[in-house]
């Protein structure tokens, strides 16, 4: 799932099945001041390369989006993946911070007390997230910020299959932003994510 889309959708949806708390269906995402890229552009660039790499490794890949002009909520993205019979959902994103010196990669997974997901999905999501962030940082040299456990992400809470949100780096950090926009670094990121998926499956 290449995170975001050209136009955000501020209409609200429950953060999980049966939840009273709501969030915008799709945030507009962050922006690279140095690269000039929008997050939705970067995530699709990387996701298309990741698709090709995973297919070359023998995986079947289902893309949530392959263009910018879509309107798919985070809950819908999670449900689409499961409805396609996917085994895992990998959500490609980039980070942002008010502090421009902050840099590094992290993944997001549900906590053990997530009220929307079963224990097996929670455990597998945490494992998938750990494998991806470790392999990603090994491939790229990015600072490893580890696995952030969160139960406020609609795109996690609506997933009936193991899921990880990959925050590849900070578009608000000049060096990391320019790295992520470069073809050579994108290749390293893709290799790292694919290596993490391989590691998850024990390949």
Model segments located where?
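Catalytic-site microenvironment of enzymes
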Residues: 1-203
């Amino acid at each position: 799932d290449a995170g975001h889309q050209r136009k955000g959708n501020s209409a609200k949806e429950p953060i999980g099945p049966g939840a009273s708390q709501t969030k915008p269906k799709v945030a507009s995402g962050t922006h690279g001041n140095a690269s000039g890229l929008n997050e939705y552009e970067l995530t699709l660039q990387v996701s298309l390369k990741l698709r090709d790499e995973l297919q070359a490794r023998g995986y079947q890949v289902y893309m949530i989006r392959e263009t910018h002009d879509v309107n798919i909520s985070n809950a819908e993205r999670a449900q689409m993946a499961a409805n396609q019979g996917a085994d895992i959902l990998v959500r490609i994103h980039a980070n942002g911070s008010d502090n421009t010196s902050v840099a590094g990669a992290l993944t997001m997974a549900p906590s053990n007390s997530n009220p929307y997901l079963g224990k097996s999905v929670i455990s597998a999501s945490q494992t998938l997230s750990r494998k991806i962030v470790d392999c990603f940082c090994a491939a790229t040299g990015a600072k490893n910020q580890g696995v952030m456990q969160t139960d406020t992400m609609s795109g996690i809470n609506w997933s009936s299959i193991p899921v990880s949100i990959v925050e590849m780096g900070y578009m608000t950090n000049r060096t990391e932003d320019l790295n992520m926009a470069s073809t050579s670094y994108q290749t390293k990121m893709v290799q790292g994510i694919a290596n993490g998926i391989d590691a998850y499956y024990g390949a």
